Amino acid sequence: MNKKILETLEFDKIKALFEPHLLTEQGLEQLRQLAPTAKADKIKQAFAEMKEMQALFVEQPHFTILSTKEIAGVCKRLEMGADLNIEEFLLLKRVLLTSRELQSFYANLENVSLEELALWFEKLHDFPQLQGNLQAFNDAGFIENFASEELARIRRKIHDSESQVRDVLQDLLKQKAQMLTEGIVASRNGRQVLPVKNTYRNKIAGVVHDISASGNTVYIEPREVVKLSEEIASLRADERYEMLRILQEISERVRPHAAEIANDAWIIGHLDLIRAKVRFIQERQAVVPQLSENQEIQLLHVCHPLVKNAVANDVYFGQDLTAIVITGPNTGGKTIMLKTLGLTQVMAQSGLPILADKGSRVGIFEEIFADIGDEQSIEQSLSTFSSHMTNIVDILGKVNQHSLLLLDELGAGTDPQEGAALAMAILEDLRLRQIKTMATTHYPELKAYGIETAFVQNASMEFDTATLRPTYRFMQGVPGRSNAFEIAKRLGLSEVIVGDASQQIDQDNDVNRIIEQLEEQTLESRKRLDNIREVEQENLKMNRVLKKLYNELNREKETELNKAREQAAEIVDMALSESDQILKNLHSKSQLKPHEIIEAKAKLKKLAPEKVDLSKNKVLQKAKKKRAPKVGDDIVVLSYGQRGTLTSQLKDGRWEAQVGLIKMTLEEKEFDLVQAQQEKPVKKKQVNVVKRTSGRGPQARLDLRGKRYEEAMNELDTFIDQALLNNMAQVDIIHGIGTGVIREGVTKYLQRNKHVKSFGYAPQNAGGSGATIVTFKG
């Protein structure tokens, strides 16, 4: 787009409005380079980025970006083979840190759907090794000791030598106190010296570095210190050399990634610019407009960004409308209306938000031309009319159907009759060429042109006859009218004179009455529209409040869930710890009594997650009533799965049962009846445990062949627990070879189990790699 329109509309001042919201020099540079485009995909991308950033701010209202400096020149120097200095490395360090923080922010972002912004976040590079290298430079511009072993060694020696110098000088201060003018160590020419009285200058051996103005004090570097100072100077030279070597080394490490770092810096700047746009939206109540594909423009409550307390107006430039002609007297805001339309289009086509209400639409124009204001050339001795006409002639040769044209005071500066005729002829030429035009004029003849001509519409700026001031309200569809008689009368001009004047233009009075009626109708419609807008604004505010509350509730819910998860994890950890202790206690005993096994199993059962209390289930209660327990019934004790027999019913409703060799007292909810005759017995998954009395103790075998992975792992867990409860020293697990999935699962399980001493494949004659032998700790 031509630069002249950007200067005319003061686009640089518009861009300056976004600068306070920027945090990076890269973002500032991109803002300064910003210009309107006619590429729809670019504009749509910019609009989508702003909308996504708005959604991001709803979830993360304090989202920010670390400030960064421009590094394009630094990266260019690297690519050309130059070595960087500490200040330049600090600039790169800041960019890498900002990139890492943005990546971390994006990785932890929830409840926001991003597409366009996601592309930028995901293009950022991660350089953990380079970040580690750059930690050698602290923010004060100092190379840390850990940058290299040699640097650390040199600095240790410098520190030791300087300590020796201080010790020597402190000793001399005490020993030679009577020879010194002051009991302090001074510095001259970078050397540590003593202020010696001139009368004692020969009593202290050393190098004289200075004499006071009075000649009473001689500044001597003691001989004992001279050698140490020379060593320190030599070490300082070594330190500088080592620091240069470190700068060269790190430059070589960073050099291959210079282009990637420069690209990251650009992305950081781009995200910063999008963020600044959204901050502007929040500050100025701006909006992201819709994009029209057919040059249709609909601006709702649009304002000029540079005008303080600007009046908001509606402008509708439909697809079929070719020209809007704003008529009426000067100083009513016609030129501002013209600039507002042009500037809003320039901002939108530059990917910026506009000062308007939601629902506003903008078109796409390849060029925007304007003839606004007095551009008379004194050097060329051109009149106002000639200056405007020269510009218009140039514009008419360049415009086409993809252009927007803004003409201020068309035909002004010459004879009114000829000027009006010329203005109508120019507008007609533009209409026939279907070029969208907004023009202002004070010629009344153009009112009739706007009424009588298709695809052309009149408009005007409202004038308050009560206050004799313009309201700057845009009235589309209503031509401007002269208020000269009304103003003259209010200012005190004789009614006779005003009456005589009005009789001379009776026909014009009829037109003015019609215009006045149109104005009244327009004002009434505007009041209704304003009321509707107020309701819409209240609804929008309520919607924002509800959305904020909804997000806060979601965050609180997630916080509570996280707390619950943490508490659950703590409970599980405690349960696992208790179960391990139970197993250790069992394993430490060589022999176990039956009741000890039962008690241990019951303890383990209590550690399991709580289940639904089936005793309160009405269906199960009805089923139990149909078959009440009686003496002699076979039962299954629910707490540890052992079968037994009811031997007697106690007075308190409990039952006595014989379970193996143990007599137990149980409540009805603690056992189930076993229906042997009516139903087929349910096969329980059993672990085949075979006890032997050989020297190495009992053994067991588990066969997992043909099992699904999850089923096999559950059986393995149960099998190992039972083996530990039975104090077994060794067990065999048959898993087969197959795909190796179950075998790998067995291996991982055994590696995690702290009770396993060792495990390995069986001998070839006992199954080879299809079986694993496990030995437990003693």
Curated annotation (Swiss-Prot):
Keyword match Nuclease: yes
Enzyme class: hydrolase
Residue ranges of every copy of the Smr domain listed in the record: 702-777
GO MF annotation terms: ATP binding; ATP hydrolysis activity; ATP-dependent DNA damage sensor activity; endonuclease activity; mismatched DNA binding; ribosomal large subunit binding; rRNA binding
Residues annotated to bind ATP: 328-335
Transmembrane residue ranges: none
SUPFAM superfamilies: DNA repair protein MutS, domain III, P-loop containing nucleoside triphosphate hydrolases, SMR domain-like
EC number: 3.1.-.-, 3.6.4.-
Gene Ontology biological-process annotations: mismatch repair; negative regulation of DNA recombination; rescue of stalled ribosome
Annotated keywords: ATP-binding, DNA-binding, Endonuclease, Hydrolase, Nuclease, Nucleotide-binding, RNA-binding, rRNA-binding
PROSITE patterns given in the database record: DNA_MISMATCH_REPAIR_2 (PS00486), SMR (PS50828)
Pfam families: MSSS, MutS_V, Smr
Keyword RNA-binding: yes
Entry similarity comment: Belongs to the DNA mismatch repair MutS family. MutS2 subfamily.
Function text: Endonuclease that is involved in the suppression of homologous recombination and thus may have a key role in the control of bacterial genetic diversity. Acts as a ribosome collision sensor, splitting the ribosome into its 2 subunits. Detects stalled/collided 70S ribosomes which it binds and splits by an ATP-hydrolysis driven conformational change. Acts upstream of the ribosome quality control system (RQC), a ribosome-associated complex that mediates the extraction of incompletely synthesized nascent chains from stalled ribosomes and their subsequent degradation. Probably generates substrates for RQC.
Record protein name field: Endonuclease MutS2
